[in-house]
From Swiss-Prot:
Optimum temperature is 50 degrees Celsius. This is S-norcoclaurine synthase 1. It is a single-pass membrane protein. The gene is NCS1. SUPFAM superfamilies: Bet v1-like. Dopamine binds at residues 107-109. Its EC number is 3.5.99.14. Detected in roots, stems, leaves, flower buds and germinating seeds. Disulfide bonds: none annotated. GO terms for molecular function: (S)-norcoclaurine synthase activity; abscisic acid binding; protein phosphatase inhibitor activity; signaling receptor activity. The chain crosses the membrane at residues 210-230. Involved in the biosynthesis of (S)-coclaurine, the common precursor of all benzylisoquinoline alkaloids such as morphine, sanguinarine, codeine or papaverine. Condenses dopamine and 4-hydroxyphenylacetaldehyde.
């Protein structure tokens, strides 16, 4: 009987079951979508400005920056730049559109960070734009560094994540040029408005008091001159 009873039937069964399981696993693996590889990129532009860090930051962080960009600093650049949520602070959402032919043509962005202590502002694209062209994340970051009391550096950065197959295409499209233009017009705007006395920049809040003091001094000096009092 020992010669007649063998494990061959069990071996055959195990082999059949094993092959079946391997086939099922193969089918299952084919049905699982492959995880797309993402690349994280960062590009930065820096420019030095001969004015105080606070004066530049006051414009970048201003709740009125959307209107200022649309109507004063970059007139005609935007087809639309509307605040659709918020009041200019963190959480504000902008709906932006450019004239026909611009890339990207339209998108929405959100102010996610405004840190006055660090002079740091971050704005994230939340709809449209590069998000429809292969990017899964896109953010503008503005950081103002004080160099001297009367000079600063504007650091403008773009951080984005893109699907690997679109990386080459997006690298050609995404540049710091828009942020460079913004830094240029904001710097020019501030430099035109600044007031210096003996090489020191006078903050806007002090200008009225300074002007008042100068007027008083002139009035006193004029009165002394009329009265014949030696100056």
């Amino acid at each position: 009987m020992s010669k007649l009873i063998t494990t061959e039937p069990l071996k055959s069964m195990a082999e059949v079951i094993s092959n079946y399981a391997m086939k099922q696993q193969s089918v299952s693996e084919r049905n699982i979508p492959k995880k797309q590889s993402l690349l994280r990129k960062e590009i930065t532009y820096e420019t030095e400005v001969q004015t105080s860090a606070d004066s530049i930051w006051n414009v970048y962080s201003s709740p009125d920056i959307p209107r200022l960009l649309r109507d004063v600093l970059l007139p005609g650049v935007f087809e639309k730049l509307d605040v659709i949520a918020g009041n200019g602070g963190v959480g504000t959402v902008l709906d932006i559109a450019f004239p026909l032919g611009a890339v990207p043509r339209r998108y929405k962005e959100k102010f996610v960070k405004i840190n006055h202590e660090k002079r740091l502002k971050e704005v994230v694209m939340i709809e449209g734009g590069y998000l429809d062209m292969g990017c899964t994340f896109y953010m503008d970051r503005i950081h103002i560094f004080e160099k001297t009391p009367n000079s600063c550096v504007i650091e403008s950065s773009i951080i984005y994540e893109v699907k690997e197959e679109y990386a080459g295409k997006m690298a050609k499209l995404i540049t710091t040029e828009p942020l460079e233009s913004m830094a240029e017009v904001i710097s020019g705007y501030v430099l035109k408005k600044r007031l210096q006395v003996f090489g020191f920049e006078i903050k806007p809040k002090l200008r009225f008091n300074l002007l008042l003091c100068l007027i008083i001094c002139l009035v006193i000096a004029g009165g002394m001159f009329v009265a014949g009092v030696p100056l």
